[in-house]
């Protein structure tokens, strides 16, 4: 995996491009918001490229049954790897330029809304929001937003101290 400092760009929820220079921290989180493992890569590395190594590291450290991911991870290699590890992949469908599939997903959402049910994707989003909260807490409360060191090793060390403090804090919250 690339570890050089570079520029990462993605589209936000409103369709605008957002760019940043540096690195990207990929975190695998258990229930309760406890980080299991983390990988620091170049900012331009797509999340799906890190999913397989991250899942293998996590499966070596803890035993779990489900791999819950969003539609960015909807590729056959990740589904296959998840099954090989003995997990059940719960990955949202990404229609990717398939108009028929996109229309079918829209119709399903409409039917669920009319009946008063939530779609499976909406329910899984609530589970995935745990990871988003961990990322937000790492940035806001544990020094992940402003990193004043240079180099992969130093940035990784800085962020791992934040992960360590976050893990200890989450475990104290669960105990008390």
Go through each PLM region and give its residues.
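Residue-level detector of flexible, active-site-proximal loop/helix-junction positions
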Residues: 42, 96-97, 153
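Catalytic-loop motifs flanking and including active-site residues across diverse enzymes
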Residues: 50, 130, 134, 160
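Helix-centered, glycine/charged polyanion-binding patches within enzymatic domains
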Residues: 71-141, 148
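Polybasic low-complexity intrinsically disordered regions
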Residues: 1-84
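Charge-patterned, long linear interaction tracts outside catalytic cores
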Residues: 146-176
């Amino acid at each position: 995996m690339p570890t050089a400092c570079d520029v990462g760009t993605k589209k936000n929820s409103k369709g605008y491009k957002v760019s940043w220079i540096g690195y990207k921290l990929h975190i695998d989180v258990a229930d309760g918001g406890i980080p299991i493992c983390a990988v620091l890569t170049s900012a331009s590395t797509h999340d799906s490229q890190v999913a397989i190594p991250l899942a293998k590291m996590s499966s070596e450290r803890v035993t779990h049954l489900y791999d819950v991911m969003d539609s960015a991870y909807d590729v056959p290699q990740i589904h296959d790897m998840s099954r090989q590890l003995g997990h059940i992949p719960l990955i949202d469908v990404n229609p990717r330029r398939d108009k028929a599939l996109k229309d079918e997903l829209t119709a399903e959402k409409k039917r669920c809304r009319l009946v008063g049910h939530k779609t499976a994707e909406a329910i899984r989003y609530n589970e995935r929001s745990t990871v988003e909260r961990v990322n937000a807490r790492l940035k806001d409360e544990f020094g992940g937003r402003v990193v004043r060191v240079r180099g992969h090793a130093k940035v990784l060390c800085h962020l791992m101290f934040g992960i360590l403090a976050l893990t200890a804090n989450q475990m104290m919250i669960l105990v008390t």
